């Protein structure tokens, strides 16, 4: 586990959302070369070092934000977004937003605020949450037009010397 860079949340978040009980900050982190996240926003990010990994396999929204959020294999969120006025580039903004939403998904910990408080303050992550709720669960893996496994049936016409196979597609 390696800390990469410290990120301080924009100062105006706390000013516009008084429910936030402290000045938020986090670290961009990697674990075995992959982006990793602190899932409890009000706690300090652990120091760099060796830690046992915990697998979270029963939380659909955590899976989705790790998959579709910053650094995920199907990242589609926060591209082209940067809080430049707050000194954050696109990667830092994507990491920060993914961290906030993962903390909400995992522990509900938003340093005293909730998603509606952030929305009223103009932070606007509620629509992202709702969008991700509608995305496919990445744990389902591939499925096919024939079900969970590809079912291929080939036939051979000896008279015309033609083999035919049914068409199977990914869903």
Residue ranges: model-predicted function:
Residues 164-171:
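Charged, long alpha-helical assembly modules
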Residues 1-158:
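Short, surface-exposed polybasic-aromatic patches that bind anionic ligands, especially phosphate groups
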């Amino acid at each position: 586990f390696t800390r990469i860079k410290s990120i301080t949340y924009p100062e105006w978040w706390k000013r516009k959302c008084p429910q936030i009980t402290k000045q938020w900050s986090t670290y961009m982190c990697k674990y075995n070369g992959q982006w990793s996240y602190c899932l409890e926003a009000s706690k300090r990010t652990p120091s760099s070092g060796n830690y046992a990994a915990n697998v979270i396999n029963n939380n659909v929204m955590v899976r989705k934000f790790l998959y579709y959020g910053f650094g995920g294999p199907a990242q589609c969120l926060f591209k082209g977004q940067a809080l430049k006025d707050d000194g954050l580039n696109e990667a830092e903004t994507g990491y920060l937003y993914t961290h906030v939403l993962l903390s909400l998904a995992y522990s509900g910990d938003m340093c005293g605020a909730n998603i509606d408080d952030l929305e009223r303050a103009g932070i606007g992550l509620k629509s992202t949450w709702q969008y991700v709720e509608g995305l496919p669960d990445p744990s389902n893996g591939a499925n096919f037009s024939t079900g969970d496994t590809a079912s291929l049936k080939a036939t051979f016409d000896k008279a015309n010397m033609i083999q035919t196979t049914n068409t199977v597609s990914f869903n």
